């Protein structure tokens, strides 16, 4: 991370990071294992499970400030994807898809990425750059309408799932 931030400080550029973990809490030990997409003990299924941990976003922010970089976020993955048009993308793909199996797959992928009880709210997005860039999804103007937009996102999410379920 420090190498990346040093490079951005020296040469410009930016980094957009998506990862999972809380933003406000101080992390203790978040080591966990996943076997076939389900949580399990880190001692179960040796060499077959993925061992992972939650990212400490506060630490990333602290390191970015050491390099005097601009830090935007966090916002949820759901907010980012809806702000940049996942609902329109899914809708357009659903219109072009004739196969029931493809529609089920599209529904499953959309739900997995945006579900507020899953990756949609668990995964966070931060943007770090040398120069201040105004990215609409991260702007303060966007923040003050958070509740309105969040309600719209939740409504859109449910509406899209309903449309896709009707098709399949």
Residue ranges of each PLM-predicted region?
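Long, Lys/Arg- and hydrophobic-enriched amphipathic alpha-helices
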Residues: 1-168
